[in-house]
């Protein structure tokens, strides 16, 4: 009985260590990508981030989106940037949600859509992005009350798309 109990106590520890062993290499790869990006080595950054992004890492997805938006190591492509932002946004990444709002505000890769922009700014603000409320409030000066009502409704009803 004592052996079984000891085994049961060790199982959670082994499980936690297994998870940590999986997460630490992913974080190390992401950090290696950030270090490369910060020194202007965009090819290395993209090589580190792409597999992580494809595996669902929201930070890597946002970083790939930003690379496509800025043309860092890849041709500038707002559509591809948006695709990566959407993947990260679906996981609650507030930076990606903010950038989706910016793209909708300024028509980067999509037609200007103030209602959609307001929606994304609201979602980003709800997830803690400190810049989103200011962008959202500035946008209200360009919107009708009906547009604001619709945008708030969309933000309340927004649910991440499941793959």
Q: Across the structure, where does each feature detected by a protein language model lie?
A:
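Bacterial N-terminal signal peptides
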Residues: 12-23
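Short helix-capping/linker turns of helical repeat alpha-solenoids
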Residues: 40, 54-57, 70-72, 77, ...
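Hydrophobic face of amphipathic alpha-helices that form TPR/SEL1-like repeat modules
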Residues: 29-36, 48-52, 63-70, 74, ...
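TPR/TPR-like alpha-solenoid signature
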Residues: 30, 62, 83, 98, ...
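Sec/Tat signal peptide C-region and signal peptidase I cleavage site
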Residues: 24-28
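Terminal, low-structured helical/coil segments at or just beyond the last alpha-helical repeat
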Residues: 130-163
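Bacterial N-terminal signal peptides that target proteins for export
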Residues: 2-13
């Amino acid at each position: 009985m004592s052996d079984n109990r000891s085994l049961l106590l060790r199982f959670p520890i082994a499980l936690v260590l297994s998870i940590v062993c999986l997460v630490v290499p992913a974080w190390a790869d992401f950090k290696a990508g950030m270090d490369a990006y910060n020194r202007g080595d965009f090819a290395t950054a993209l090589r580190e981030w792409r597999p992580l992004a494809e595996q669902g890492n929201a930070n890597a997805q946002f970083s790939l989106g930003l690379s496509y938006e800025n043309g860092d190591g890849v041709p500038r492509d707002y559509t591809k940037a948006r695709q990566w932002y959407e993947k990260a946004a679906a996981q609650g990444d507030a930076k990606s949600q903010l950038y989706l709002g910016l793209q909708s505000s300024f028509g980067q890769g999509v037609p200007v859509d103030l209602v959609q922009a307001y929606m994304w700014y609201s979602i980003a603000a709800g997830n803690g992005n400190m810049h989103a409320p200011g962008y959202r409030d500035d946008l209200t000066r360009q919107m009708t009350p009906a547009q604001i009502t619709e945008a708030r409704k969309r933000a309340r009803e927004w649910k991440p798309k499941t793959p």
